[in-house]
């Protein structure tokens, strides 16, 4: 896979993909609209507070790499931007609607489970069920031309593993595994504390019964 993005570039590309599908009448986006989309509180993780200057710098870098284009007319005072991230005439990256929806949501929110992705992509594409969502994710993870996503170690107490995109570089699997181990240890310690509290309550109840017998 040749496309590598910074976290801010991933946010900009994700927003352009999202708005192309969800608000086609207002696409391509002006700088103001794109900044608002980048700082949106819903369907964003983390929530950012970028200035227009920061977004402009990021967009200019993406334009230089031909991942974004300025579609404003010659006499227009306002620039309007659209992504050239995938499905362009001469580009190598081709994604169907389901694949694009998943990549978009992963760019905007980071690691998520198939169940979360199925719910959060409902305005971008349609999945019959979670199994279909996971099947498409596995296809993206096992592309002959290079994986676009990776399956992360399953978190303690969770039924599903999360998936993460690879457009910002390789994911530190050891860090995720350590995080999962830490959560498992914390859960184990919590269970031990619960058992100790239960035992102490029994002892208190027994002592209270003895005291009541003595007083009576």
Swiss-Prot record:
Gene3D superfamilies found in the cross-reference section: Winged helix-like DNA-binding domain superfamily/Winged helix DNA-binding domain (1.10.10.10)
Domain of life of the native organism: Bacteria
Family, as annotated: Belongs to the UPF0502 family.
Protein name as catalogued: UPF0502 protein VC_A0740
Originating species: Vibrio cholerae serotype O1 (strain ATCC 39315 / El Tor Inaba N16961)
